[in-house]
Amino acid sequence: MTASETIATAINQIDEKKEKLKKAFDDLQAHRSLLSPSFSLSWSEIDSHFSSLQSSLASRFRLLHSTSPLEHDSYRIDASDAGKSSSSEEVSEQPVVEPELRALCEKIDGIGLIKYLIRIWDDETPLNQEVSAAIRYSPDTASMVLDAIEGSNYTPSSSGRSFDVRRVFVLLMEVLIEINANITVDTRNRAKKLAYHWKSKVGVKPFEALVFLHLVAAFELGSEFDTEELSDYVFMIAKYKQATLVCNKIGVDRKRVGKLIKTLLDSGKPILAVKFMYECGMTDEFEPIPVLKSYIKDCREAALRVCVEDNYSLKSQNEASDKEVSALKPLIKIIKDQNLESEFTQEKVEERVEELEKNKALRKRNTTNPPKQEPQQKGKKRTRDCKNGSQVPVPSQQLLSRPEALLMPEHSHHGLQLNPYGLMTSAFSGVVVNPLTGLFGSGATPQSLYYAQQTGYVLPPQYHPPYYSQ
């Protein structure tokens, strides 16, 4: 037994040990006349003290587990994974279940469960693992979850904070899907009525659609609704991490999934489209790698346009950096999730993000603490060139404050240099060069560079490869 399992077992035994302590306390009270008159401790005080310790220990232990939570936002449907033997799977440690949560599940108290989860909800500490372990103690998990959704009249104001109870509904149904609970005919019929009621509230509200699709997925109601309509709702919730899970669970056929992917591509959402390609088993019909490579170039070009449109001001450079970094981070996640690092060795996406963040920090530092001009000492003559006596140009405060100058390498060489967005600037002190001159013809739009190119060569325009086979 690991240390973690030992701690979890000990916490779960607190109630049992507290009962033994109460029995001993009652025996002691029977001989109260023999005790000191100053002994006035009551059982309620002892019980309150131990309950407080129990809650604190359980909370800290749950927080300790949450530092490396299992990923519940990525579900694979690769058929090859299904054939792997259970012996090769990693065995996750059983999370601790607080006694109050376990008792609610054992009593099939859906309303109490909702109130409890709202009370302890913490955005920084996911509850998926603990709830998944707890609801397994329920004799009728599906009925309990349905009771929680149907009968919840718990108002956020009574908890003293603003909270969307629908988040708890989604969590419970997500866990219900995960454990593949048994669903009786009566429970399914009740869920069907609730699903139709929730469907009437969807309209154009994505989160309402998310709850509705979870009802359909968790209670196996896919055959009760029109598949085309369900597919439209999946497109509406595509941005949520559970979108591919419910899409696979509600029975949307491959043809409609393919149509959904094309719609995402046409709507300018290539990252979401690629997620559906991998997690809905559509990589045999679509080519995700060209889509991602094209996305990288589009991100670079979009950031470059932000700079050019505002004459490469400091503000535009910061906005462009933020825009590109925020666009590349979900790409990095997909590359890691799908083990695609070998496909993007030339693009060096992570290095690009680090470079952008470093350059932004440098610009901020130089703007906050601009270089000070040394006061000119009296009686000293200006330095002149030994050949023609001309004054050697000294970089002015104005030049040093220019964003282009701040982005130049510390040791510049003669000639033209590339700034982080692929535009050329002069390396000669005191000479201002139009960053677009020589790169693009008059009236031409600026062209982007590949991430791996740091030599100053500008590539000719490239046609994007097709997103999917014709």
From Swiss-Prot:
Summary of the tissues where the protein is detected: Expressed during seed development and in dry seed. Preferentially expressed in the chalazal endosperm during early stages of seed development.
Note, other: In cv. Columbia and cv. Landsberg erecta, either FRL1 or FRL2, but not both, is functional and required for FRI-mediated up-regulation of FLC.
Keywords from the UniProt entry: Coiled coil, Developmental protein, Differentiation, Flowering
Subunit composition and interactions: Component of the transcription activator complex FRI-C composed of FRI, FRL1, SUF4, FLX and FES1. Interacts with FRI and SUF4.
Coiled-coil intervals: 336-369
GO biological process: cell differentiation; flower development
Keyword Signal attached: no
Recorded family membership: Belongs to the Frigida family.
Membrane-traversing stretches: none
Function text: Required for FRI-mediated up-regulation of FLC transcripts, but not redundant with FRI and only partially redundant with FRL2. Required for the stabilization of the FRI-C complex.
Disrupted gene: phenotype observed: Reduced levels of FLC expression and early flowering, but not redundant with FRI. Frl1 and frl2 double mutants flower earlier than frl1 single mutant, due to a partial redundancy.
Compositionally biased region (Polar residues): 388-400
Region (Disordered): 355-400
This protein's name: FRIGIDA-like protein 1
Record carries keyword Coiled coil: yes
Organism for this UniProt entry: Arabidopsis thaliana
